[in-house]
Amino acid sequence: MTLSFITRWRDELPETYTALSPTPLNNARLIWHNTELANTLSIPSSLFKNAAGVWGGETLLPGMSPLAQVYSGHQFGVWAGQLGDGRGILLGEQLLADGTTMDWHLKGAGLTPYSRMGDGRAVLRSTIRESLASEAMHYLGIPTTRALSIVTSDSPVYRETVEPGAMLIRVAPSHLRFGHFEHFYYRREPEKVRQLADFAIRHYWSHLEDDEDKYRLWFNDVVARTASLIAQWQTVGFAHGVMNTDNMSLLGLTLDYGPFGFLDDYEPGFICNHSDHQGRYSFDNQPAVALWNLQRLAQTLSPFVAVDALNEALDSYQQVLLTHYGQRMRQKLGFMTEQKEDNALLNELFSLMARERSDYTRTFRMLSLTEQHSAASPLRDEFIDRAAFDDWFARYRGRLQQDEVSDSERQQLMQSVNPALVLRNWLAQRAIEAAEKGDMTELHRLHEALRNPFSDRADDYVSRPPDWGKRLEVSCSS
């Protein structure tokens, strides 16, 4: 089967990119590819028999027209000016059989006009982390870009140490970022901002294209998608680590996996990025940062969208966020209805978990085993202050009894939303260290495990992290 690629971005937004081809690595070789995603995209298996080929930027498929996009943004709350694809190249937009499209973005593709002081390269460590994280998020049901392939090479890349150069192909319906709009707004080119909005609506919100109120309705949906995404991050315990405006997806996807981390101990102020000295992107600050980023996007639209309409959309953010968050947390607690005491019970559990530094994922998974008429719980042994747990647990069981639902039905629901497995940093690190020594077994094994995060397991993937694996420092260097 021949893959079909189109050139909408190249044809319709000529001032937003520089056309150029990837710069191949030395002795590049394919070490992993996403078979399930490849099947979804109808990619022939024969394409993966090459050592590198398109996966390593050595060849292009018919119809591909590679380019690097320009955008700007606020980084850590400060205007950073022009940024852009400093090491990534959009290879092409695949047209699928159902009429939708999928961007193919090659990360680590070499120098571009937007590389600034960088070398245009990515390292094996960061490509493995992104592949694992994006697939983990996908199987958790959270909107995200996805990873299609990884190549490693003999090309040295200099970071804190010398690391092997690598490339990753990331796919997504679109790579439109808040930063695309900021770029032209701050260049005082509002018509180009409008062109970006029209492009987005035409291709991703086509049902609004002929509506005279299309810009307001479109921005309302961008706000809602962002609020929903952040609610999902918070419920699963995911910290992004670098929520700059250029890393915010217009479609509400999790984009740009850098110094991310899933909670081990429940620590509301968890900071996963060791460069975030002020804690701007701490776990508990993510909802506020996302709203701040939406405000920056709204500002770019103000030349052609009424400010009152923009503010109304922004004002809806918190309620949408709380609605999604509340629904998901009630499911995690096994509540089938909404009662006035629910928030208090949840907050009391969080307070107890924070005091005891309880493991976030394990706590909710073990809570899924609760029998509403039994005071016995395997979770009790996870707490030092047994009296405090017993008091909370008795009231929790009383709340469960209000719903008049069988234990088996409720447990089934809870186990479908409380994962047994999340991508803890130490699991990724173990796969990385093996891969850097040439052993890809753990990389493939972990990828396979992450496809079933809600299944019970008996291995160390679902155990408490070892002491060395807690609070691993992760930086933006990749």
From Swiss-Prot:
Disulfide bonds: none annotated. It comes from Escherichia coli (strain SE11). Belongs to the SELO family. The lineage of its organism: Bacteria, Pseudomonadati, Pseudomonadota, Gammaproteobacteria, Enterobacterales. Its EC number is 2.7.7.-, 2.7.7.108. Mg(2+) binds at residues 247, 256. Keywords: ATP-binding, Magnesium, Manganese, Metal-binding, Nucleotide-binding, Nucleotidyltransferase, Transferase. One of its GO terms (molecular function) is magnesium ion binding. It catalyses: L-seryl-[protein] + ATP = 3-O-(5'-adenylyl)-L-seryl-[protein] + diphosphate; L-threonyl-[protein] + ATP = 3-O-(5'-adenylyl)-L-threonyl-[protein] + diphosphate; L-tyrosyl-[protein] + ATP = O-(5'-adenylyl)-L-tyrosyl-[protein] + diphosphate; L-histidyl-[protein] + UTP = N(tele)-(5'-uridylyl)-L-histidyl-[protein] + diphosphate. Nucleotidyltransferase involved in the post-translational modification of proteins. It can catalyze the addition of adenosine monophosphate (AMP) or uridine monophosphate (UMP) to a protein, resulting in modifications known as AMPylation and UMPylation. It comes from the Bacteria. Its cofactor is Mg(2+); Mn(2+). This is Protein nucleotidyltransferase YdiU. ATP binds at residues 84, 86-87, 107, 119-120, 170, 177, 256.
